[in-house]
Each structure stands twice: as structure tokens, then as C-alpha cells.
């Protein structure tokens, strides 16, 4: 493991441009005047003081979004016109990639290289993908059984509340905002309190792109105040949320108790990554590392339960151990860095607590498991073996750099154990046997099965969960469906030569 994980001086000198709320096309202070600090997780230093929105600010933002939806141009302009603005937005994201990447690094502890070369380009391409759908939203002509002609209209659902997580603000902004814009919706966005800066900058870019005032509104704040106000607001027509299962339940309850607004939830996971005896061991070990330590393990789809068939267990663990020890922890701006700090102090403490639970419950700590460096929320990449299904580290989502290896014997056994979880977000299968692939992929109760790979996410591939990992789909044209309603229009016809 490499040294030098004390953060970068770049954050101290970087000028933060936007710290207020973004409502009706303008950056404004919160009504109360309250603020909060956002922290650089690599240095534990205050980056900026940000306006704190509460219920009254959400009300103001919803009022702007409602006016923009009911009387503004966005839902009424042609799909082609919306497409052109969204493509301009995508271009502006690319033109400001360095700024967006820097904000992701200093505000969220993410790594400069992966964000600059993957997450930001994927974000802009997500806008391009859904821009391409904006002028292709159409209804259908219906074959009625009587002298009636009918057709369907697909109309935007209205004002949407987006509650965005802290583990990938730019990517999640694009994932939620792009399809909603394509559909013709207006929206209020509540970024995570730990990472508001990227979302505020993206709001600025939306104005430059020509998105009309009131269509995109951003209210920084805390979940129990601003987030709760979004979930329970009587004039928000739909809510999307990405985050923990516990908070997702709260969001769903608030939506039901207010105006019965629909919700789309992408929640927690405890995904199985299954390695069979005939697998390419080197490839499987490589993807097990990527599937758990990418973004410091702060991924809902992390394949943190690595099931290894007994015939290759010891060899696989040895390869995994070497790869974990080589996973370089350094300054997030260093392009050679593979591992950065956890996003915030609360998450840092939670991960360390889970590691301690693993040791107390009898799992074997092979490597890692300790804080790293003198400053910042760094935790060594961690590998446990001799893990059993009843241990906390095998049951609960950790959302950190911790791999648990579990041994299995048969296909039937591993399917049963892989499904013995309240979650169902993703999974991985490594084998050369197509029959095993077919059996396992049809048996695993999860929203994705990645065969001989992992993290195969793409804007054209619908992503979402089974069970307590939520419902609804993001990415793919299926995501657009959440933001559209179907209206049937029927009129009688008289003396028609045919029906």
C-alpha cells in the first residue's frame, strides 16, 4: 500500500463558485439565512459554507417548478426543441469537465482519473441518450370493439422531486434529470448534504444551456428537513430517491401519506459475486476487486459477498490478497491512485464498525481493516475470509472497501445462499459453463446478472432492484416511462366503412 493519503493542496486554492440555492433560474440565499459547511474528506477541512434550505425553501422551489410546468414553455415545446437544449447541456458538461471533476474530488473524495475519464463523460452522454428520445415520445392508435376511435397520449407526469445521493453526484444528476427533462417535466432537486457543490454547478450549466427558469431547481439541505419536505409535498407529482433502504422506506411512507405520489427507489444492496471452479481465476479476482473497491466501495451494486467454489478457494484468495495489498491509496488527484477516502465521517465510522463486527464474529481478517494516514477518512482496502452467512458483514450493506469471501460446494447451494438476503440489486457469475450461466442467471433474484464481468452499467441497460433494493428502473428507455403518464382519448365515429 502506498503512502501519501493526506489529500491535495488543490482544494485549498480552488475557488468554489456556487454555494446558494438555485430557484427559478437564480442563485438565492435560504429564507432562514441558515448555512452549513461541506467538508473535504481527504483533508477534513471545510471547503465551503453552503446555504441550507428547509421546508419553506422547498415550497418556494416547488412553486417555481409548478409555474414552469403549468404555464411555462418546457412541457409545451416540441421534443426537437427540448432535444437541442439537452444536447447543449451535454456539450457544456464536457466543456466544464475539469471543474466538475475537481468538485467531485474535493467534495466527495472521489478519484480524479475515474471521474474525469468515465463518470463525467458518461454523465454528458446520458443527456445525449435521452435527448435522442425527447422527440420520439408517441402514443398509439387503439382498435376499439365498438363504433369508437381512440388513441393514447403520453404526457409528462409533472413536477418531480429528485433526492440525489452523495456517492456520485454528477452521474446521479444526469441519471435522474435527463429522462425527466426529455419527458417535459420540471423538478426540484435535493442533493446530499455531503456533496452539494457539483449539483449546484450543474444547475448553473443548465441555465447556460437554455433550460427555462423554474424547470430545474436545487435546494441544498438535510434529509430530515429538506428531503422530508420533498417527499411529503402535496404539489410534487413524483419522487425519485437513491440511497439506503431505511430512508427509502421513509420516502415511500411520506409519498403515500401526502398525495399518493408515485416513487422510484434505488436502494441498498448486498450483491453476490459467484466464482465457480472452472472460472478464469485471474479475471474473476480482477473483477472482484473492481466490483468492491471502485469508488472506495461506496456503490450500491458492490459485489461484497464473494462466493468461491471450494476447488479454487485457496488459490483465489491468494490472488485476491495480492491484489488488495497492491490497491494504491494516495492523494485523490494523483492519477496512480486507486483508493481514496470515504465520503464523510459518519460513513467512515460505520465502515470501521462493520470491520470490527467481522473480527468479533470470527471472520479471518486477511489484510487491511485499519484507518490509513494521518488525515482524511481513509480506510485500508479490507479482505475477510472464513465468512459465514449469519455474520453481520455477510448480511448488511457496508458501503465501503470490504470484501467477504464465502466458500460453497454446489450450484444449488450457492443459488440458495445468494438469494438468502433482503436485497436484490445486482450479481456476478464467473464460469465457462453456459448451462451454469443459464441456471444461475434465471435463479438469482436481482435486477442485474453480470456474466464473467462486473459493473457492466450502461445508459441503455435498465438498472434497478428486486426486493428491498427498491423498484423502478434508471437508465435505458424504461427510465423515461416513469416520467410519462398515458391518457386515452376516445371519440365516437358514425357511418364508418370499417372499424
From Swiss-Prot:
GO terms for MF: oxidoreductase activity, acting on the aldehyde or oxo group of donors, NAD or NADP as acceptor
Function description: Involved in the biosynthesis of the antimalarial endoperoxide artemisinin. Catalyzes the NAD(P)-dependent oxidation of artemisinin precursors, artemisinic and dihydroartemisinic aldehydes, thus producing artemisinic and dihydroartemisinic acids, respectively. Can use both NAD and NADP as proton donors.
Keyword NAD attributed: yes
Gene behind the chain: ALDH1
Organism, as annotated: Artemisia annua
Principal cellular location given in the protein's record: cytoplasm
Name of this protein: Aldehyde dehydrogenase 1
Lineage of the organism: Eukaryota, Viridiplantae, Streptophyta, Embryophyta, Tracheophyta
UniProt xrefs under InterPro entries: Ald_DH/histidinol_DH (IPR016161), Ald_DH_C (IPR016163), Ald_DH_CS_CYS (IPR016160), Ald_DH_CS_GLU (IPR029510), Ald_DH_N (IPR016162), Aldehyde_DH_dom (IPR015590)
Residues under site feature: Transition state stabilizer: 167
Signal peptide: none
Use case: Artemisinin and derivatives (e.g. artesunate), are antimalarial drugs due to their endoperoxidase properties; they also display multiple pharmacological actions against inflammation,viral infections, and cell and tumor proliferation. Artesunate may be a promising treatment for COVID-19 mediated by the severe acute respiratory syndrome coronavirus 2 (2019-nCoV) (SARS-CoV-2) because of its anti-inflammatory activity, NF-kappaB (nuclear factor kappa B)-coronavirus effect and chloroquine-like endocytosis inhibition mechanism.
SUPFAM superfamilies: ALDH-like
Location of the protein in the cell: Cytoplasm, Cytosol
Top-rank taxon, per record: Eukaryota
Catalyzed reaction equations: (+)-artemisinic aldehyde + NADP(+) + H2O = (+)-artemisinate + NADPH + 2 H(+); (11R)-dihydroartemisinic aldehyde + NADP(+) + H2O = (11R)-dihydroartemisinate + NADPH + 2 H(+); (11R)-dihydroartemisinic aldehyde + NAD(+) + H2O = (11R)-dihydroartemisinate + NADH + 2 H(+); octanal + NADP(+) + H2O = octanoate + NADPH + 2 H(+)
EC number: 1.2.1.-
Tissue: Expressed both in apical and sub-apical cells of glandular secretory trichomes. Also present in flower buds and, at low levels, in leaves. Also present in non-glandular trichome cells.
Amino acid at each position: 500500500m502506498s503512502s501519501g493519503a493526506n489529500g491535495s493542496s488543490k482544494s485549498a486554492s480552488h475557488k468554489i463558485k456556487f454555494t446558494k440555492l438555485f430557484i427559478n433560474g437564480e442563485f438565492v440565499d435560504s429564507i432562514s439565512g441558515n448555512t452549513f459547511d461541506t467538508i473535504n474528506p481527504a483533508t477534513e477541512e471545510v471547503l465551503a459554507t453552503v446555504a441550507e434550505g428547509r421546508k419553506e425553501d422547498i415550497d418556494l422551489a416547488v412553486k417555481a417548478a409548478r409555474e414552469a410546468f403549468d404555464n411555462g414553455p418546457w412541457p409545451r415545446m416540441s421534443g426537437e426543441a427540448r432535444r437541442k437544449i439537452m444536447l447543449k447541456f451535454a456539450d457544456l458538461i464536457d466543456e466544464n469537465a475539469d471543474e466538475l471533476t475537481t468538485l467531485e474530488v474535493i467534495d466527495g473524495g472521489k478519484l480524479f482519473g475515474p471521474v474525469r475519464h468515465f463518470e463525467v463523460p458518461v454523465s454528458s452522454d446520458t443527456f445525449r441518450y435521452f435527448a435522442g428520445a425527447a422527440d420520439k415520445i408517441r402514443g398509439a392508435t387503439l382498435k376499439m370493439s365498438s363504433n369508437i376511435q381512440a388513441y393514447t397520449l403520453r404526457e409528462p407526469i409533472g413536477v418531480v422531486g429528485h433526492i440525489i445521493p452523495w456517492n456520485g453526484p454528477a452521474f446521479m444528476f444526469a441519471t435522474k434529470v435527463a429522462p425527466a427533462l426529455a419527458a417535459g417535466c420540471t423538478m426540484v432537486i435535493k442533493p446530499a448534504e455531503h456533496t452539494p457543490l457539483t449539483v449546484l454547478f450543474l444547475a448553473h450549466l443548465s441555465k447556460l444551456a437554455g433550460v427555462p427558469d423554474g424547470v430545474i431547481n436545487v435546494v441544498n439541505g438535510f434529509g430530515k428537513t429538506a428531503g422530508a419536505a420533498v417527499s411529503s409535498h402535496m404539489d410534487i407529482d413524483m419522487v425519485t430517491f437513491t440511497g439506503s433502504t431505511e430512508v427509502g422506506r421513509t420516502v415511500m411512507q411520506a409519498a403515500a401519506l401526502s398525495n399518493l405520489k408515485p416513487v422510484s427507489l434505488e436502494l441498498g444492496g448486498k450483491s453476490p459475486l459467484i466464482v465457480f471452479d472452472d472460472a478464469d481465476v485471474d479475471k474473476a479476482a480482477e473483477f472482484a476487486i473492481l466490483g468492491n473497491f471502485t469508488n472506495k466501495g461506496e456503490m450500491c451494486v458492490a459485489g461484497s459477498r464473494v462466493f468461491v467454489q471450494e476447488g479454487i478457494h485457496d488459490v483465489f484468495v491468494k490472488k485476491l490478497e495480492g491484489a488488495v495489498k497492491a490497491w494504491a491509496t494516495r492523494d485523490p488527484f494523483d492519477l496512480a491512485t486507486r483508493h481514496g477516502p470515504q465520503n464523510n465521517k459518519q460513513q467512515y465510522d460505520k465502515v470501521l464498525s462493520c470491520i470490527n463486527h467481522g473480527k468479533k464474529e470470527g471472520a479471518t481478517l486477511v489484510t487491511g481493516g485499519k484507518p490509513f494516514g494521518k488525515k482524511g477518512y481513509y480506510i485500508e482496502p479490507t479482505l475477510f475470509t472464513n465468512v459465514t452467512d449469519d455474520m453481520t458483514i455477510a448480511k448488511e450493506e457496508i458501503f465501503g472497501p470490504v470484501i467477504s469471501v464465502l466458500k460453497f460446494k454446489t450450484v444449488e447451494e450457492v443459488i440458495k445462499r445468494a438469494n438468502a438476503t433482503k436485497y436484490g440489486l445486482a450479481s456476478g457469475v464467473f464460469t465457462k459453463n453456459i448451462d451454469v450461466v443459464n441456471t444461475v442467471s434465471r435463479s438469482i433474484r436481482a435486477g442485474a446478472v453480470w456474466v464473467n464481468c462486473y459493473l457492466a452499467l450502461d445508459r441503455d441497460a435498465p438498472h434497478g432492484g428486486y426486493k428491498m433494493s427498491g423498484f423502478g428502473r434508471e437508465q435505458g428507455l424504461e427510465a423515461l416511462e416513469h416520467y410519462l403518464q398515458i391518457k386515452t382519448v376516445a371519440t365516437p365515429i358514425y357511418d364508418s366503412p370499417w372499424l
